[in-house]
């Protein structure tokens, strides 16, 4: 059987610590049922080879778990999928693809951890 996933174009911080999709989502299918709170698209190659452009990432709304895990982060109007390290003045967002430099999200710009990436897949045709 194929399982349906709602994949949001963008995840945003709501009031407090709730998150919601922007209302625009695609329904995609995969042959496994995977536990998650949100699903979003991978755009670009900055997280290759683990997360490929066009794949779906599955997110659990865990808050910050540990340094070096891969999280969805809402910062400066964008959703980033990156390895995250907490530093004194902000969050360091690290790409897996070495061609990309780190990004730094200062705490005074209110970067928010949406949740931890708990899975990824390339959708299958229904």
Predicted regions located by residue number:
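Short coil-to-beta-strand transition motifs
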Residues: 74-80, 108-112
